[in-house]
Amino acid sequence: MSKVLILKSSILGGYSQSAVLIDHLASHWETQGAAITVRDLGGKDVLPMVDGEIASGLRGGAELSVRQQEMLALSDTLVAELKANDTIVIAAPMYNFTIPAQLKNWIDFIARAGVTFTYTETGPKGLVEGKRAVLVTTRGGAHKDGPTDHVVPYLKTVLGFIGITNVEVVYAEALNMGPEAHDKGMSEAKHSIDQLKA
């Protein structure tokens, strides 16, 4: 049985197009027997914003404040969740050409030297290996493979840095460029999702 972690990151609630696609994917994969865990980073599972105190605490050490200890424990939980699943599905709507702050915050909690990556004499090495990632990205305009897409290249870089190099991408483009473009973008994205195996 495939174990899947789904990360939602939209802040738009019931208006979220990425959530529609993620729910479609979850339903599709559940019929294939996948065990799915959902973390709604833009909703009920929003994380504390990583500030200087938290960032310092995530390095560990003996002299941690109570808050730092709590945030380190939260980070450990998120990392364990990441490592426990075979496939990581990331809902990544484009906000102002990049990812939502809530998703970036999750990255800041799990990208830890000595935990999810390390530095060697030949450069960095990811420690979260043998995983697969699926990015489901929605955007109001048409940005795929262009200079204004700071979503997919960035996420591929981060995932590769921690060891996840098997990355598939589902695009839903031009969703704010009229009803026909919206319907076409969502239909094509759902078709792409239907081709994915859990």
UniProtKB/Swiss-Prot annotation:
FMN binds at residues 10, 16-18, 94-97, 138-141. Its EC number is 1.6.5.-, 1.7.1.17. Its cofactor is FMN. GO terms for molecular function: electron transfer activity; FMN binding; oxidoreductase activity, acting on NAD(P)H as acceptor; oxidoreductase activity, acting on NAD(P)H, quinone or similar compound as acceptor. The keyword NAD applies. It catalyses: 2 a quinone + NADH + H(+) = 2 a 1,4-benzosemiquinone + NAD(+); N,N-dimethyl-1,4-phenylenediamine + anthranilate + 2 NAD(+) = 2-(4-dimethylaminophenyl)diazenylbenzoate + 2 NADH + 2 H(+). It is an enzyme of class 1 (oxidoreductase). The keyword Hydrolase does not apply. Belongs to the azoreductase type 1 family. This is FMN-dependent NADH:quinone oxidoreductase. The lineage of its organism: Bacteria, Pseudomonadati, Pseudomonadota, Gammaproteobacteria, Alteromonadales. The gene is azoR.
